[in-house]
Amino acid sequence: METIYGSSLKEADAVYACQFDGQGGMTPIDMNGVATPVQPFWQHLDYRNPKSYRWLMDTDLLPETVKAGLAGESLRPKIMRTGDGTMITFRTINNSESERPDQLVVFRIYINSQIVISSRHRKVHSLEQVLSDLQNGIGAKTTGHWLVEMVDAITDEVGNFIEDLHDNLIELENMILEQRIPGRGGLALLRKQLIILRRYMAPQRDVFARLASEKLLWMSDEDRYRMQEISDRLGRELDDLDGCIARTAIISDEITSMMADAMNRRTYTMSLLAMIFLPTTFLTGLFGVNLGGIPGNEYYLGFAIFCLLLFGLVLFVAWWLKKSKWL
């Protein structure tokens, strides 16, 4: 196994770098220190940083395929074994205030028994808990343990986001029950978020399951067992996503039905008004022809009587429609 010295990482300009102390804590990387399975190195990079990118391209610690992946070419969740190390790509929730959570962050890891090199561009908030545990002395002790803690934090964030989406879905369903039409934009955004999450979390669950089943030397049986539990948990969350997607389709159908009913009611009302005023329109048109003079023109009460006649006709037609249960 290749000896990895702390000095080989000094030019990386990492977001943060540390060495596990083997007891759940962390220490700064000593330039003369050596990475071991008991006290491995962890270096976290922003691959858009020119110095970090240059280090990734120039270092001898990584295979060429891993360099390209860590530098931003790997997008979908997947796992790739290279010698004694493994390249893993994850997707996690974007909790940055200025961006939407469904704009998932890509998080890439190269890991073996001695070293973890992770990279991203946008901030991975899931790392904060993992880093905090290490700072408090209750974190990972090995690289395999670190990976399990990492995917556990990612899955927790995914689960919390799914709960938020589920709450939004319930609000839309309550609006439908109250005969209020939700905005199309809100439903479209919710459905898009559900579909995007489903698209990337399904292969991510497969990655977790593969990590749990493969005999990776740097993962203990306990690590594999916990990884399988996390994979199962993500699978249940995917089932919830499928149910939510189906419910958005039902809500869309209900909105279409409610809008059609509203349009039909308006059309029906206009038709009834036309039926009520059609006889009066006919009579006023007939009396206004003026071919032989307007009937009753010479009688001073003629106009009043004609208006009463029209009013009575309107009442009669309205009564007839009511009796016929059209109103």
Swiss-Prot record:
It comes from the Bacteria. It catalyses: Zn(2+)(out) + H(+)(out) = Zn(2+)(in) + H(+)(in). Its main location: membrane. GO terms for cellular component: plasma membrane. Gene3D superfamilies: CorA soluble domain-like (3.30.460.20), Magnesium transport protein CorA, transmembrane region (1.20.58.340). GO terms for molecular function: cobalt ion binding; cobalt ion transmembrane transporter activity; magnesium ion binding; magnesium ion transmembrane transporter activity; zinc ion transmembrane transporter activity. This is Zinc transport protein ZntB. It comes from Photorhabdus laumondii subsp. laumondii (strain DSM 15139 / CIP 105565 / TT01). The gene is zntB.
